[in-house]
């Protein structure tokens, strides 16, 4: 299955990686690794994560307070948010897959 980030989700991901790398290079690498693991889980088992809104699901990022919010559009997994779980709940709800 293909994976695609909407532009706002890509910005969130880039900003989160940058912030963690500013804290320490090692932390940035760990964050990147955990997000990549979450993406692999989604690609392997797209329907296994919790359904949170209509056709959207959330895959938790291990060891970090982030969730990947995604929908499944035919043969593509569309990540609509890389959401920090302690900020602005459901801010991503109006984003389109």
What does each model-found stretch correspond to?
Residues 18, 28-30, 50, 55, ...:
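Solvent-exposed interaction patches of small proteins and small membrane subunits
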Residues 44-77:
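Basic/aromatic recognition patch in beta-strand/loop cores that engages polyanionic ligands
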Residues 8, 46, 59, 87-89:
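Short linear/disordered segments characteristic of secreted peptide precursors
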Residues 39-43:
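Short proline/glycine- and basic residue-enriched helix-capping loop/turn segments at helix->loop/beta transitions
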Residues 1-32:
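Arg/Lys-rich, positively charged N-terminal/basic patches that mediate binding to nucleic acids
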Residues 67, 71-97:
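Enriched for short, Lys/Arg-rich terminal
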